[in-house]
């Protein structure tokens, strides 16, 4: 049997963590079968809104063949727009698909009904959600539904990870919705429950999307109490290196697994990025999740 796992729809490297983890999970679970990496919708991956550009794009996903196609992530709200053509084709050809580590939150009743009707007409073999809201929204439309977790919480079980040491112990700071806070110790050892966080207004009072371009002008902490502060940058790009490397010990890579090894080698994570916290927990390190981002389901087992 051929299983093809979507692994291209990254809006940031955090998407690569749960998709690569899912690939590793299926390879370990089904060693007797052929588990391959596959493409997702080019529109989702590159957020294409221009009709001409979308027409020019070669959507290889439409030509992939497998017994089972695996789609994942926050794709349920756009499943009709981005996935329907491929799903209709694969079902017509006698193939199947599953939705694993999938999410569809913040939807209106009419949107849930429309998507639910599509899932009823073109049913997946399995729907395993990564949050309870999605499960509650669609469990009545897909008979084989499971209130699951995000596979980012499984990275240390599904992917072989190495560790390394810097010249000093370190913790991770990763922020993308606001300026990085200032960290201070209440006294004693550098532990996550012993770190105070002081938030800052954006530069010149500008919205963060603009003020981040002036972030390199700010003073940044190099360390705290003998622990280095490592900044993991999840938005992969080569255009804005003044953002990527605005602070000491900034880490960015096109290798998603290396981020996981940075997390495994750290002592803890403080972040407003849910996946940054997820992989820290997956590697048995504490994490402090700040601010109002939708919380993924997770396991403490």
What feature does the model see in each segment?
Residues 1-301:
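Active-site anion-handling motifs in enzyme catalytic cores
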């Amino acid at each position: 049997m051929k299983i093809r796992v979507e692994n291209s729809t990254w809006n940031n490297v955090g998407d690569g963590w749960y998709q690569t983890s899912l690939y590793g999970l299926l390879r370990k679970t089904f060693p007797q079968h052929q588990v391959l990496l596959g493409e997702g919708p080019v529109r989702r991956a590159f957020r294409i809104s221009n009709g001409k550009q979308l027409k020019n794009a070669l959507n290889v996903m439409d030509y992939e063949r497998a017994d089972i196609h695996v789609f994942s992530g926050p794709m349920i709200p756009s499943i009709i727009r981005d996935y329907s053509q491929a799903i209709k084709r694969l079902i017509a050809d006698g193939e199947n698909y599953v939705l694993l580590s999938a999410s569809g939150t913040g939807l209106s009743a009419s949107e849930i009904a429309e998507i639910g009707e599509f899932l009823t007409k073109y049913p997946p073999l399995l729907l395993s959600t990564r949050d309870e809201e999605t499960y509650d929204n669609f469990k009545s439309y897909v008979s084989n539904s499971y209130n699951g977790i995000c596979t980012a919480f499984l990275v240390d079980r599904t992917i072989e990870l190495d560790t390394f040491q810097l010249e000093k112990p370190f913790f991770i700071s990763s922020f993308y919705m606001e300026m990085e806070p200032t960290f201070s110790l209440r006294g004693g050892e550098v532990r996550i429950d012993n770190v105070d966080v002081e938030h800052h207004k954006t530069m010149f009072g500008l919205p963060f999307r603009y003020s981040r371009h002036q972030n390199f002008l700010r003073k940044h902490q190099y360390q705290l109490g003998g622990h280095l502060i490592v900044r993991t940058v999840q938005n992969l790009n080569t255009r804005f290196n003044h953002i990527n490397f605005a602070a000491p010990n900034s880490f960015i890579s096109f290798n998603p697994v290396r981020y996981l090894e940075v997390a495994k080698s750290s002592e803890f994570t403080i972040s407003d990025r849910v996946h940054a916290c997820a992989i820290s927990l997956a590697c048995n390190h504490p994490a402090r999740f700040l601010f109002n981002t939708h919380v993924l389901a997770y396991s403490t087992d």
